[in-house]
């Protein structure tokens, strides 16, 4: 197989990450992630770079965003990778609809595209005539899992709020659905639900306002750990130790919080392995393997102090 050569490296919002010295026989994989201010994606990048070094048979070029709402950077990255003629694009989309048209153009250019972590919107794919598999976790099931852990502690009638992720991201919608599933199953009362766009400081401000409006809150369901950290900071500032918090992602920052009880639980979706796994899928297709179809599930695990 003759692989296309990469003309230039792709800029990351926090600097320039160029792949290893390129060889004629190495395929070039463009990795498009979300915010590198988020520990989850920092770990993902580290895992992907380690995987590149371990395999040694592909060149990685990785792009991240400055913030979780910096969708234009992702779109520009895809367009840049198309112009550069990479062999594969592996993407965790920040917006499940907005990225479909540029990814369609990539596929039309003969580039293998792997959608991982955050699924693309099914309606948008149908509208654009795109058939693309998803490699990633059960976000709804994971949120239900951690939500059930909170419900078990609070008991029926427990009063909770939801801190949502980006409205345009399918995994945010799925995690909200999972939280709502847990609320219904556990007989909890939902007092409020609003987005903090995956961001720590925004979650801090949002939850501070929620707590003022609803001082009777007993539990918080945060759609990612970065926002859970913001909630914990708000609770510490308010001097409240009676409110239970759960998150999603199992980033390193929450380990001590789970150990000392500031965070009840989170969901590990093994972010450090996620991009590496998606890259492997892309390389299998490039090597002549079958086209991926449907949903290729990756692992999740409930993480508690026990």
Predicted regions and their residues:
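A residue-level marker of the well-folded mature domains of exported/periplasmic proteins
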Residues: 2-7, 23-306
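Hydrophobic alpha-helical membrane context
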Residues: 16-17, 46
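Sec/Tat signal peptide C-region and signal peptidase I cleavage site
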Residues: 17-23
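Sec-dependent N-terminal signal peptides
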Residues: 6-15
């Amino acid at each position: 197989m003759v692989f296309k050569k990469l003309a230039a490296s792709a800029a990351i919002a926090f600097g320039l990450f160029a792949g290893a010295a390129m060889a004629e026989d190495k395929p070039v994989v463009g990795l498009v992630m979300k915010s590198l201010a988020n520990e989850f994606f920092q770990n993902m990048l580290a895992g992907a770079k380690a995987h590149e070094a371990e395999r040694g048979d592909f060149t990685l070029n990785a792009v991240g965003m400055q913030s979780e709402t910096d969708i234009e950077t992702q779109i520009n990255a895809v367009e840049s990778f198309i112009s550069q003629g990479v062999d594969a694009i592996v993407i965790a989309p920040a917006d499940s609809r907005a990225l479909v048209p540029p990814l369609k153009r990539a596929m039309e250019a003969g580039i293998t595209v792997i959608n991982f972590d955050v699924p693309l919107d099914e309606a948008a794919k149908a509208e654009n005539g795109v058939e693309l598999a998803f490699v990633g976790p059960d976000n709804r099931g994971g949120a239900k899992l951690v939500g059930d852990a909170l419900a078990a502690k609070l008991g029926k009638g427990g009063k909770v709020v939801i801190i949502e992720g980006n409205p345009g991201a399918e995994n945010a919608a799925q995690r909200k659905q999972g939280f709502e599933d847990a609320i219904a199953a556990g007989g909890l009362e939902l007092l409020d639900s609003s987005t903090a766009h995956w961001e720590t400081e925004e979650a801090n401000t949002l939850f501070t306002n929620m707590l003022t409006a609803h001082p009777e809150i007993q539990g918080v369901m945060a759609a990612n750990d970065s926002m859970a950290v913001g909630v914990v900071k708000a609770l510490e500032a308010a001097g409240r130790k009676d409110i239970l918090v759960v998150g999603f992602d199992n980033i390193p920052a929450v380990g001590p919080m789970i150990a000392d009880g500031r965070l009840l639980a989170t969901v590990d979706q093994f972010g450090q392995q996620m991009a590496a796994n998606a890259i492997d899928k892309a390389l299998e297709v490039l090597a002549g393997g079958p086209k991926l179809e449907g949903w290729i599930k990756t692992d999740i695990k409930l993480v508690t102090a026990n």
